[in-house]
Structures are given as C-alpha cells and as structure tokens.
Amino acid sequence: MILRNDIKDLPQGIDAAERDVFYQDSDYLLREIFIREKGKGNALNEGIRLARNDLVCVLDADCILQEDALSKAVKHFQNDEVAAVGGRLLVKREDSCQLEAIQFCEYMKTFQLSRRIFARLNAQCLISGAFGVFRKSTLLGMNGYDIDTVGEDMELVLRLQEQDYRQSKKQIVYDPTAVCYTGVPHSIKRLLHQRDRWQRGLMDCLIKHHNLIANPHYGLLGLVTMCYQLVVELLGPVFWVIYTVLLIDKNMFPLFSVVFAGYALVQIGLTIFAAYIDIEKNKWSLLKWMPKLILTTLEEMVLQIPIMVVRVVGMITFHWRRLVW
C-alpha cells in the first residue's frame, strides 16, 4: 500500500473525497491511496486501518529499501514478544555534494553508535519514521499514531514503551542489517528547516512523556535514554550557543579553544569508530577514507553552529509553531 499525503491536486477523474483509492493492482497487491491534506499521522493511521496483514511497514516516500531489508526485519516477529523492528538508515547518495557527505557521517554515527547502544540496553525511544515494521495489532491497540505532534515516530515508541512497562513487556528491536536508504536535504535552508522540526518534535515528546524522565520505574529507558534526550539532544543546543557566544570574549577564548579542540578530537574518533564498525572491506579501505572522514567531521562541526541556533529558535517558538511541518 502506498499512501500519498498532502496532495492538493488529484489526477483527472479522481473525485474529491477525503480518501480515494486511485490505483490497485491485484498482481502486486498494491493500493495507492490519496489523503487530502490531513497530515502524516492521519495518513499513517488510515494505512494501518486498511492494511490486511498482521505486520505493517512504515516507509517514507523518499526511501529505498535494500533488497533483503524487509525479510531481515520480519524474521524478528517469529518471537511473539517483538512488537516493532527498526532498521538502519543510510544516506542515499544522489548528488554527491558535500552537504550530503556531512549528513552521511552524521547518520553513520547515529545508527552505528547511539542506536546500537540504546538497543543493547533495551531502552529505545525511537524507531525512525523513515523505516519501521510493526505488528498491526499493537498499533491498533494504541490507537495508532498521535496526530497532535510533528514527532509522531518518537511519540509512538515512547507510548509503546510506557504501555509495556505498565502491562506485559514487549520488545522493540533494532536490526542494523535491515538497511534503508533515505533522501536528505540538499540545501542548507532545507536542512535547517528539517532540524527545526525535529527539535520541536523532540520537545513535544519530552513534554508529553515527562513522567518517564529519570524515573527508575521505567528502568534504563527512564534513567539513561530519557535523560540523554533531555540533557544532550534538547538542551545541548542551548549549551552550544552559549559556548559559541563566550568564544567572542577574548579572556575566555584560550580555554574554550582547548575545549573545542578536545570536542573535535572526540567527534573525529567517533566518526572513525563508526566507520570501522560499518566497513565491509579490509582495514586499508578505512585508511584510504580516513582523511575525508576527518575533513567531513570538521565541516559537520562548523555546520552545527547554524543548526544549533535554529534548534534553539525552534524551542523558543515551540508554543505557537508546535505543529508547523
């Protein structure tokens, strides 16, 4: 099933109903359904409701699955305790521009390090909306995605985790071998707009599920994952902006330069370590790409300055721009 959301002009011959079956091919079991400007959450919920099988795959329109991604994700559901499986996102290299390369390194660190760590702790708070597989019964039992947020993917997983701790424990699995290639912004403007939305979605989810933060009742999810999301992901941009402003002070410049150099070394180390985990060839391949990895990481750090500013602005304007996509 293919869902198209926010379509303003339907093809000729399609009536203006809120939900329309535009294309159906029985040979491939494909149905294409248009949802008229109701938001991503509504479109996903309609797809879940109309799905005919026990498992539902959520996939963004700009994503391409690796040939064996679905089979690798689905095998986990042989275990009845598994409620959802998230795959690994890789950047789809289209234009080979430097901005794309920077995001490639960023995604590599995110999915090869932090997602793996949280999965090992059984304390995941997010299955990316770009690619995830769920039991239909689980989604229906939770009334689907929350339509009152732009962070619907994170909110769903937090609600699932909270529900599982209250009732029977279900597993949320991260499979790094189930690979999905996703498109990324090719301009600074679009990238900043994306990160602004992500920040508002994160803030919304932490407000809605504030009871999980530092709550030992929810195990490592509350004590580690949620604290990390609050301190590093939500408040981190505030600290970064303050740090950047303090760099202007000549008296503070030497100290903060040392801190920046240390931070740069840590980031370079994380990038190389993530690449080492990711590499499928021999160690010489890693050595060959190491100069480019180091350069790209340094460029990523420079790019973080406007990104952090935009994220702080997103937090400041949260109350009147909460649902702006």
Per-region residue spans from a language model:
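Long helical/loop segments within the catalytic core of UDP-sugar-dependent glycosyltransferases
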Residues: 18-28, 36, 41-43, 53, ...
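Short mixed-charge
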Residues: 2-28
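Short aromatic/hydrophobic "clamp" motif used to bind/position activated sugar donors
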Residues: 56
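Conserved glycosyltransferase catalytic-site signature
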Residues: 63, 130, 150-157
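Membrane-interface alpha-helices
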Residues: 177, 315-325
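Membrane-embedded multi-pass helical conduit in multi-pass membrane proteins
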Residues: 228-319
